[in-house]
Structures are given as structure tokens and as C-alpha cells.
Amino acid sequence: MNIIDNFEQENIAKLTANKKIPDFEAGDTVKVTVKIIDKAIEKDGKEKLTERFQAYEGVVIAKRNRGITSSFLVRKISHGEGVERRFMTYSPIVHSIDVVKYGVVRRAKLYYLRHRNGKAARIREKLISRAKPKTAIS
């Protein structure tokens, strides 16, 4: 490994020390919680910074794995309009990433979903079977 790779690995380890990033792919539905900092002006004229969390849930249509600059693109339908938002995977602004359901697709980039709406934009859900406990045969 060269110096740049070592530097990236150290920074990724620091950024992921207090949060868990799940394994997800294109086609999975994720819920990304993002930290938002608002400025509010108080009555005496001072600025006050308030911090809140906002959830963004949608289908991952692209994932870009590039070390510390890795990102993923999430698409959702909001009030009848398609909205896409790109999140940096290791950004401190991203508070948490939760996988809501896993999808079955045959492509790495699902840009074709931009031109589909309604039932045509559905993605099959991956059914995860629960392991049955093995019983001893006597």
C-alpha cells in the first residue's frame, strides 16, 4: 500500500468509529438520516445554531466505491416528482444508514428508473429466509 491508501484507510477508520455502515447495493431501499444545522436569529440579534436530524428514504440507484470519496445516489418520489440525492458514504453529515428492504436487480446502475413511474418502477424484493433450527434425529 502506498502513502495515500494508508491515509485514506486511517481516515475511513476514524469516520466509521462511532457508526456502522451496512452492506447495500443498487436496488435496495435505504433510510439515510442526515444531520442538518439551522441558523436562527434570536430576539437580541444573536445567531443561534440548532441541530436536527432528517430522514430520507428511497431506492439506491447507483453506488460509487472510491475509498473515502465513496458515494451513493438515492431516488424517491416526493409529491409526484422524482427526487434524487447523492450522499457521501463516510461524510460526518450522514448520521446513519439503515437498509429497509433488499431488492433484486440485474444492473449496477438503475438510471432507467428515471423514465419509469408507477408499477413499471417497482423492484422485486429479495426474500431472506430465516434459518430453521436443526433438530436431532433419534
UniProtKB/Swiss-Prot annotation:
A Gene Ontology term for the protein's cellular component: cytosolic large ribosomal subunit
Signal peptide stretch: none
Keywords for the protein's UniProt record, in alphabetical order: Ribonucleoprotein, Ribosomal protein
GO MF terms, alphabetically ordered: structural constituent of ribosome
GO biological process: translation
Keyword Ribonucleoprotein set for record: yes
The protein's role, per its UniProt record: This protein is located at the 30S-50S ribosomal subunit interface and may play a role in the structure and function of the aminoacyl-tRNA binding site.
UniProt record similarity statement: Belongs to the bacterial ribosomal protein bL19 family.
Name used for this protein in its record: Large ribosomal subunit protein bL19
